[in-house]
Amino acid sequence: MLNDILSKLPPQAANPALLIGHETGDDAAVFKINDEQAVVATTDFFMPIVDDPYDYGRIAATNALSDVYAVGGTPILALAIAAMPMNQMSPDTIQKILSGGAQVCANAGVPVAGGHTIDAVEPIYGLAVVGLVHPDRIKRNCEAQEGDDLILGKALGVGILGAAMNKDELDPEGYRQMVETATKLNAVGAELSKLPGVHALTDVTGFGLIGHLLEICHGSNLAGAVNWNDLPILPAARDYAERG
């Protein structure tokens, strides 16, 4: 739907400095400043996916920072985006959400320099993030090459555990594994971008492994093959998957 909406917007003037726009569904926009630096810009936010407000803030912030890492960049600055039902949520709960996000940013060495808050019917939290990347190290999701191997920076299974949580079937250990993985920074992306054999990057989030792999394959005009037995899967997620 979003692609259809974007396609009907007024045409924008071509700018050779815009290295990544919205055309290929990459994780962030990239704008070239000079031969040594390009600015990475992204924003990401969502409604709560866990009940604990601190964990919610941590997960949302990690997800937003991930978009910069996913194009090979290093985040340098964040702005908080918060829409909260002020007449329904206590100041303490809101503070925990913001603190969770701020802690993740502190762990990443990224200052939260400000932001914007509004009153809303449903809580929404996330970040607008600015990063830097060398123009020669930008990695897109549409430049994979035939013969490339698929490398995952995290174990899979957060979606399965989230589904179990929504059914009130997730045990404490499963919750721990889910949150620990969802709050692990994808900083490895910035390091992988420096390797000559790495041609494409993305972060595996809402669309799952298959959804994001299809995005890479379609954008690169390739097909991909995945061996289920080779995939790193969280132990708790494997257990819940086997239960059906």
Tell where the protein language model's regions lie, with residue ranges.
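Helix-biased detector of long, well-ordered alpha-helical tracts
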Residues: M1-G244
